[in-house]
């Protein structure tokens, strides 16, 4: 029996005894006295009216109920008092005795108190005997005195009872709190995230422990406190975030993994320490004659307000691909979310469980590829699956969509949550309402998988309750699958994604709504002097430039290679060129890789070469096989050099091992096209490079219309299709303002053509995270919107969107 239950019984007993003693009055009283003497002899009790209590050592009040009733162990207690006659000091003594009440109301001690304990006296005698005495009923004066004492004793007993009750309550609270912290007990009800309780049979499964909404160290956060709290917890190298993550329970319940641990199933597990719990694992339909064929390393996971919204699974192994597709079919899944690459750091993370093209049969499931769309952060594959077997009773086909997030780095987490939020939005929009659980997997099915699940749930909670409970939700889903959200970096990334969504929201637009949006953002915002467009750009300029992540560009040897000291590439995406033999610090050029719509590193955003960096510029072009150069500045503007001429006006010119020859020059309406033959004399190889020199950008401001920009973007994309999708080198003077505007427009227009959707704000925001000051002015930002609107108006295919 639990200790707290024993305390309840004990306390109840004490209260009952105390209550009985305090509320009964008898006509006759038996008094027991301790006598300080070497021999115990009877002594007459003398009536002391002046101080009746001084002569009483123990007072027992007889109950009024029927005579000849035996009370069961009762405690007689003697209290210290001084005898005014003989100066003896009486010491407290407690004895367990049985007492019989005689018909005349006198006390008849059983066995003459033979079990009474003796204790040393505090008086002068060397030895002391404790001798209980029985006194006959005294006269009326004694009875009156004792009646006067009864209310005092009743008050004392009542106070003692109250103290006992308070003590028991405190002990029970402490025991209960301790049990909650240990979180090891079973529960007979399942606490859903929306507050409903679903009853289950006792002892059937270990269920989720409830997380109290109050009295918790990491309670839910209101969204308006999110930014402040994240900044506080990220201080001192994420110290508080690490503490919060480490406080998460590894498993809030006592769960078993018996099925996963069977010898027949061990080979089906990718990692020996990542096993599904028995109570939440996905059960496959057993295959006749195949033992333990109901097992797969996958677990049901709750969403915010939806039970078993997800199935968290490990990345299939070669020997479990058939089981994976069997699970997809049996669970009526329509959406698969993959958050790993097939190989990372040369290690297999997941078997390819789909054909590249055509169809393939996995067990009794035929999978055919219907469509593949490759984007910068993820790939979307559409499969048609069908159960095969009895050809006379063919099952209907089903459409399965796989969303494969490809931007998760081998180490850590994505440097920005923008891509993950776009990915998640696409998953939410495409999963049919009728479908079964969404299958989410990475390699182990816990780290990145858990991160995706938590972001999804917390975005739902944010919209519904205007608060988030990351700690509580991670704790709950860890009771369904171990180690969900595996690292503190993933835990911080969840908060960053939530903050990103809270601060900037969903800024995607259908092309049909662009005109209305433009009218709206030109209106003044109440309470401010800015319109909506100015507020958008203000948010962009508030993005912190990470000067501490520009180490190489700030080295003394490289400072002279920078045209503008405020625009230096970040370390994580700077373009690296081969080091010259015997020369240090020769791998630097002021240029950054920039992601496009469909692929990473689509562009190289570079400053206009200085005279002493032309060789480095061409070494970069050669090393990264760039076949298209976009120049957005004149060599000189307003009497200042903006870019050194890095190509010959005619003939050829050498820059170190690189020679450049002008083969052809053609003037177009707003730009010049130059075909250059570039040769690496050391490698004895040549390449054709095409330069697009845009003349439509005035020295001050922006182009008068977007026609020229639309034209040059189309020409560059055509060149890319012919020469291969190597990076497009884009430069102006500093490689930020006009360069960023070109990259933004090229990316936005490509998405408009593919999806009919645009997001100018997030596109520019992403550029600024990759290189400082991309799209440098409000005019340039506004120009992006105007060019997109012109593009939609100019092309009939997109004019139909209206």
Curated annotation (Swiss-Prot):
The protein, known as: Receptor-type tyrosine-protein phosphatase alpha
Encoding gene, per UniProt annotation: PTPRA
GO BP: integrin-mediated signaling pathway; regulation of focal adhesion assembly; signal transduction
Gene3D superfamilies from the UniProt entry: Protein tyrosine phosphatase superfamily (3.90.190.10)
Subunit structure: Part of a complex comprised of PTPRA, BCAR1, BCAR3 (via SH2 domain), and SRC. Within the complex, interacts (when phosphorylated on Tyr-798) with BCAR3 (via SH2 domain). Interacts with GRB2.
Source organism: Homo sapiens (Human)
Family that this chain belongs to: Belongs to the protein-tyrosine phosphatase family. Receptor class 4 subfamily.
The record's account of how the chain is modified after translation: Integrin binding to extracellular matrix induces phosphorylation at Tyr-798 which induces PTPRA localization and recruitment of BCAR3, BCAR1 and CRK to focal adhesions.
Transmembrane portions of the chain: 152-174
Gene Ontology CC: extracellular exosome; focal adhesion; membrane; plasma membrane; receptor complex
């Amino acid at each position: 029996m639990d200790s707290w239950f024993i305390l309840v019984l004990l306390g109840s007993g004490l209260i009952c005894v105390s209550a009985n003693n305090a509320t009964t009055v008898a006509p006759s009283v038996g008094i027991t006295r301790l006598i300080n003497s070497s021999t115990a002899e009877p002594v007459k009790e003398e009536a002391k009216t002046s101080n009746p209590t001084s002569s009483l050592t123990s007072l027992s009040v007889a109950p009024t109920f029927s005579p000849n009733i035996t009370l069961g162990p009762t405690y007689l207690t003697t209290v210290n008092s001084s005898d005014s006659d003989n100066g003896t000091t009486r010491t407290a003594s407690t004895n367990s005795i049985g007492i019989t009440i005689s018909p005349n109301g006198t006390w008849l001690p059983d066995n003459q108190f033979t079990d009474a304990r003796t204790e040393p006296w505090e008086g002068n005698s060397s030895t002391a005997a404790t001798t209980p005495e029985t006194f006959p009923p005294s006269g009326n004066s004694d009875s009156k005195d004792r009646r006067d004492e009864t209310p005092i004793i009743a008050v004392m007993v009542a106070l003692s009872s109250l103290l006992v009750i308070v003590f028991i309550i405190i002990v029970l609270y402490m025991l209960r709190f301790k049990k909650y912290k240990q979180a090891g007990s079973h529960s007979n009800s399942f606490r859903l995230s929306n507050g409903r309780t679903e009853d289950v049979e006792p002892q059937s499964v270990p269920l989720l422990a409830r997380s109290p909404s109050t009295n918790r160290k990491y309670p839910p956060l209101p969204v308006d406190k999110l930014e402040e709290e994240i900044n506080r917890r990220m201080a001192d190298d994420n110290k508080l975030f690490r503490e919060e993550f480490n406080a998460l329970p590894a498993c809030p319940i006592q769960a078993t993994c018996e099925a996963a641990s069977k010898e027949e199933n061990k080979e089906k597990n990718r990692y020996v320490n990542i096993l599904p719990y028995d109570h939440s694992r996905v059960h496959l339909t057993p295959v006749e004659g195949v033992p333990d064929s109901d097992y797969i390393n996958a677990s049901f996971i709750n969403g915010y307000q939806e039970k078993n919204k997800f199935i968290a699974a490990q990345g299939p192994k070669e020997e479990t691909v058939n089981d994976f597709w069997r699970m997809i079919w049996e669970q009526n899944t329509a959406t698969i979310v993959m958050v790993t690459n097939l190989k990372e750091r040369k290690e297999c993370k997941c078997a390819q469980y789909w054909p590249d093209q055509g169809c393939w049969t996995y067990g009794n499931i035929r999978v055919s590829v219907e469509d593949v769309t490759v984007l910068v952060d993820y790939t979307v594959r559409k499969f048609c699956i069908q159960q095969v077997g009895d050809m006379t009773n063919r099952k209907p086909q089903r459409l399965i969509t796989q969303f494969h997030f490809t931007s998760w780095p081998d180490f850590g987490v994505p440097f920005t949550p923008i891509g993950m939020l776009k990915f998640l939005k696409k998953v939410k929009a495409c999963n049919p309402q009728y479908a079964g659980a969404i299958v989410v997997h990475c390699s182990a099915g816990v780290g990145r998988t858990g991160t995706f699940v938590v972001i999804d749930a917390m975005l739902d909670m944010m919209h519904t309750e205007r608060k988030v409970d990351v700690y509580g939700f991670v704790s709950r889903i860890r009771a369904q699958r171990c180690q969900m959200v595996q690292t503190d970096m993933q835990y911080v990334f969840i908060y960053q994604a939530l903050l990103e969504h809270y601060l900037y929201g969903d800024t995607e637009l259908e092309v049909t709504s662009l005109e209305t949006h433009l009218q709206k953002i030109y209106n003044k915002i109440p309470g401010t002097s800015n319109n909506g467009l100015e507020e958008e750009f203000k948010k962009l300029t508030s993005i912190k430039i990470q000067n501490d992540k520009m180490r190489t560009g700030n080295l003394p040897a490289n400072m002279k290679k920078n045209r503008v000291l405020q625009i230096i590439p970040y370390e994580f995406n700077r373009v690296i060129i081969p080091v010259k033999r015997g020369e240090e610090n020769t791998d630097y050029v002021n240029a950054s890789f920039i992601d496009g719509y469909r692929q990473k590193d689509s562009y190289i955003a570079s400053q206009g070469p200085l005279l002493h960096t032309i060789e480095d510029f061409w070494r970069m072009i050669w090393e990264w096989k760039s076949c298209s150069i976009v120049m957005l500045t004149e060599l000189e503007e307003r009497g200042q050099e903006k870019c050194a001429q890095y190509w010959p006006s005619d003939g050829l010119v050498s820059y170190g091992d690189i020679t450049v020859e002008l083969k052809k020059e053609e003037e177009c309406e707003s730009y010049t096209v130059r075909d250059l033959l570039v040769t690496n004399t050391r490698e004895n190889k040549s390449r054709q490079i095409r330069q697009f020199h845009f003349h439509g950008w005035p020295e001050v401001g922006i182009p008068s219309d977007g026609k020229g920009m639309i034209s040059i973007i189309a020409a560059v994309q055509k060149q890319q299709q012919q020469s291969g999708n190597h990076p497009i080198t884009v430069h102006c003077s500093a490689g930020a303002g006009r360069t960023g505007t070109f990259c933004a427009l090229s990316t936005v227009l490509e998405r408009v053509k593919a999806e009919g959707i645009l997001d100018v704000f997030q596109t520019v925001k992403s550029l600024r995270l990759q290189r400082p000051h991309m799209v440098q002015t409000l005019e340039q930002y506004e120009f992006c919107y105007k060019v997109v609107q012109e593009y939609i108006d100019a092309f009939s295919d997109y004019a139909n969107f209206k």
